[in-house]
Design a protein with these regions (language model features):
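Symmetry-related core transmembrane helices of the 12-TM Major Facilitator Superfamily/SLC fold
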Residues: 175-192
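Cytoplasmic helix-loop-helix junction between adjacent transmembrane helices
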Residues: 115-153
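Helix-to-loop junctions at the C-terminal end of transmembrane segments
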Residues: 69-82, 168
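Central cavity-lining transmembrane alpha-helices of secondary-active solute carriers
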Residues: 57-75
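Structural signature of the two symmetry-related core transmembrane helices
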Residues: 85-99, 181
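Helix-loop boundary and gating motifs at the non-cytosolic
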Residues: 5-63
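Paired small-residue
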Residues: 108-116
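Juxtamembrane intracellular "pre-TM" segments in multi-pass secondary transporters
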Residues: 1-20, 196-217
Length: 217
């Protein structure tokens, strides 16, 4: 028997709740977009003549923005703010960052782009991490949900860096920002149109399981 057959993979994937599958898809596409931006941006701005100090200061600003926005996002999530809305907000901020960095030719715009990039990450990560256990059910442990989510993150980053490397080979390294914009728009689209549907389907699945248990008891 082929352990990697399509049917086995499909059956494994369908074990997870509909809403969790949606979150996993969002994390995969986020990682694809972010992979190239995070790892290849220093190369782009180094080729423009930026010093190591200038590039490092941009990364520092991104980290500082990420820390402060994480605190703010965590506070709002503790106050029952919707993680889906937070992820959509992160997508919009990331798009702003991508536009700035795509057209950036000087140090000031580079710093602005890095600031928005860090802010987007700070909004996204607490929300994306919280979404995993909230969308697990009695049959799926949060540890299994996290393992799938982190696998999607790793695969996405790998694909993102690969696409960016191909773009660099063809002397169009800034394609990483266009890829990230497309990924963010797609994530925004699927969350906007499918999250409500997936929640309803999840409720139906839960209701069916309860009725099945009652009949068997």
């Amino acid at each position: 028997m082929n352990l990697f057959s399509t049917s086995i993979i499909s059956n494994y994937w369908e074990r997870f709740p509909v809403s969790l599958r949606l979150i996993i898809k969002a994390r995969l596409w986020t990682a694809i977009g972010a992979g190239g931006v995070l790892y290849l941006s220093p190369i782009i701005f180094n080729s423009l003549g930026f010093t190591a100090e200038q590039i490092g200061s941009g990364i520092t600003i991104a980290a500082f923005a990420g820390i402060t926005s994480r605190f703010g996002t965590g506070y709002l999530l503790d106050k029952k703010f919707s993680y889906a809305k937070a992820i959509k907000a992160a997508c919009l901020v990331a798009i702003v960052s991508d536009f700035i960095l795509f057209y950036s030719q000087n140090y000031i715009t580079y710093l602005c782009g890095q600031f928005f990039l860090g802010t987007a990450a700070g909004i996204y990560w607490p929300s994306a991490e919280l979404a995993v256990p909230l969308n697990c059910n009695n049959e799926i442990k949060s540890s299994e949900g996290y393992s799938l989510a982190r696998s999607a993150d790793a695969i996405g980053v790998t694909l993102g860096v690969l696409l960016g490397t191909i773009g660099t080979y063809f002397e169009f390294a800034r394609i990483i920002y266009l890829i990230d914009i497309l990924c963010m728009l797609y994530i925004f689209h699927i969350l906007l149109n499918n999250l409500g549907i997936s929640k309803n389907e999840a409720k139906i699945e839960t209701k069916d399981n309860i009725e099945f248990d009652i009949k068997n008891s």
